[in-house]
Amino acid sequence: MNNLVKLTISQAISGLKNKEFTATDLVTAHINQMDKYRCINAYITEIPELALQAAKKSDFLIQTNQARPIEGIPVSIKDLFCTKGILTTAASKMLQNFTPVYDATVYSKIINAGGIMLGKGNMDEFAMGSANINSYFGNVINPWKAENDDIDLTPGGSSGGSSAAVAAFMAMAALGSDTGGSVRQPASYTGTVGIKPSYGRCSRWGMIAFSCSLDQAGIITRTVEDAAIMLETMMGYDEKDSTSLNVEVPNLRSAVNQPIKGMKIGIPYDLMENKSLSSEIITMWQNTINLLKDHGVEIVSISLPYINYALPVYYVLSSAEASSNLARYDGVRYGLRVEGKNSNINEIYELSRSEGFGAEVKRRIMMGTYALASTNINSYYIKAQQVRRLIVNDFTNSFNKVDCILIPSAPTAAFPLNSNQDDPVTMYLNDILTIPASLAGLPCISIPAGFSANKLPLGMQVIGSRLDEYNIIKISSAIEKALNLKFIPKGF
């Protein structure tokens, strides 16, 4: 029964339909896997009893021919999404005892489609981080190890628990969030598939806010087809979210295994000169370009001059929005309450926020508050918004010539957990390749496309024009099929 955890979602759906095994069997196998690899720390909260109850319901619906689209599929839910009656912490001491009274819309969509939650995935606190070292509940460990080395590696962030759970076969899919790359970069580090849809495709209702103009739900799976299946269940208009788009949900699964001959793929060749990119990443990029050429794709050189400013623009805007969003956690309205000797209101604010937030969250709040100060707002926040528009224009101009854009997902393979912890700028550079598409609100997917010299997975990123999730699935599926590589951590 342990082999059940190795199935893809499409295989599991078929097996359940054909009565080869039950949803209870499938969930039990994943619970056993979670028990075996708890040292990875992929989950903050586990709910095996509730998962088994849900599995019994799924078995009944399957037996009575009432199965929903993803009936019986075990999933991990990032601990940023509200789950009624189940602890939701955002990996912060500030919310360590918070139990929501309602469900996030995107979580409801997954459950209503038949998905079964196994638990709440670990993450960087309030989704701020690129290495999953900022969780109040401890680091997540990447299931992958470098060849001939036993050093613990980062699973990426902020959805590190999500990516680790999928890579270690502790969930078939994991709901994550992507603000500046928090689904795609972890997917790259763990040999999984991570997709972020266009901004507004998935509801943000019930997703604890970090940066409202950038936050978007995403999904991590082990294949492109599985990502398409899951994303279809998540997308759709939600009147409770003012940024939700009232547009038709495409049939993404139909994009899998479609011919790509004649499509045009844009390559920003100038980016290959960026010193942050390792030689292994550039080699993988060039190999993927050659593979696409062999399949009849036209490669077009494009220019994205303003993406060199994407990183500072992102950290000004996201920190400013975080400063505003996190102001509510003061120990009086929301969050951990710490009272001092005097118990006056200012002391409660100061002590609660000092003790409730971790170092990285405090750093970004301070950066954001500085950028929004009346003496600084024109120089920082307003200027960043103006440059963001130039970045959007770069992409718009490029998509007048091409169907998709191909760039790597991360500048390197996964790095040791204990490296660069005291160097926030170096940490921020890990998102240099994912942030541009986030600023433009574009759909993008990271797929595993090669290995480093140390046998660690490397990811490629396909970026589409606004609302064109179909073509990024189409291209990434073709790359996945042509490469035909297996991405399974040693020992799993």
Curated annotation (Swiss-Prot):
It comes from the Bacteria. Its EC number is 6.3.5.7. Heterotrimer of A, B and C subunits. One of its GO terms (biological process) is translation. The active site is at 78 (charge relay system), 158 (charge relay system), 182 (acyl-ester intermediate). Belongs to the amidase family. GatA subfamily. SUPFAM superfamilies: Amidase signature (AS) enzymes. NCBIfam families: gatA. GO terms for cellular component: glutamyl-tRNA(Gln) amidotransferase complex. One of its GO terms (molecular function) is ATP binding. Keywords: ATP-binding, Ligase, Nucleotide-binding, Protein biosynthesis. It catalyses: L-glutamyl-tRNA(Gln) + L-glutamine + ATP + H2O = L-glutaminyl-tRNA(Gln) + L-glutamate + ADP + phosphate + H(+). InterPro entries: Amidase, Amidase_CS, Amidase_dom, AS_sf, GatA. This is Glutamyl-tRNA(Gln) amidotransferase subunit A. Allows the formation of correctly charged Gln-tRNA(Gln) through the transamidation of misacylated Glu-tRNA(Gln) in organisms which lack glutaminyl-tRNA synthetase. The reaction takes place in the presence of glutamine and ATP through an activated gamma-phospho-Glu-tRNA(Gln).
